[in-house]
């Protein structure tokens, strides 16, 4: 219902609506668990059930790992439905929002999966926590340059691996 109500506006203004995978925590048990669209087959089902080109899947690669899924597997299941990415690294436990390559996710496999599906959508670095400890303008500028370099290298790798 929610997305269907927004569709007329999406068409009128040429804006795509993205349905993102989520996770949540069980504080009593001290565990992270899946939530809306954390199962890639469920995610694909929701996008398909609306059957409109203005609805795409947004895969937050960090959320997928926290929910017990490998991002590359989710990418392959979502395929052409995937229109937006939230890219950041984590340790499979915490939503770290740090630069790719600074924690434990398998970026070789993730970029390969994106190339395999011919990914053409948005590529958003969601790395705000990386910048939390940067104190000066100079450090922040260096951090932004590093983030841009990593993002460009990832995009170039995806493009060079496309079949």
Where are the regions that the model predicts?
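Short, well-ordered beta-to-alpha junction loops that form the rim of enzyme active sites
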Residues: 20-22, 61, 127-128
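Conserved, mostly hydrophobic/aromatic
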Residues: 17, 60, 85, 114, ...
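Alpha-helical packing segments of well-folded alpha/beta enzyme cores
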Residues: 2, 6, 110, 147-154
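Active-site acidic/histidine proton-transfer and metal-coordination neighborhood
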Residues: 1-56, 66-67, 161-162
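C-terminal helical cap(s) of enzyme catalytic domains, especially alpha/beta-barrels
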Residues: 135-162
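Gly/Pro-rich active-site loop or hairpin
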Residues: 28-44, 48, 63-120, 133-142
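Short acidic/histidine-rich active-site segments
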Residues: 122-130
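Residues that line or immediately flank small-molecule/substrate-binding pockets and catalytic motifs
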Residues: 82, 89, 126-127, 162
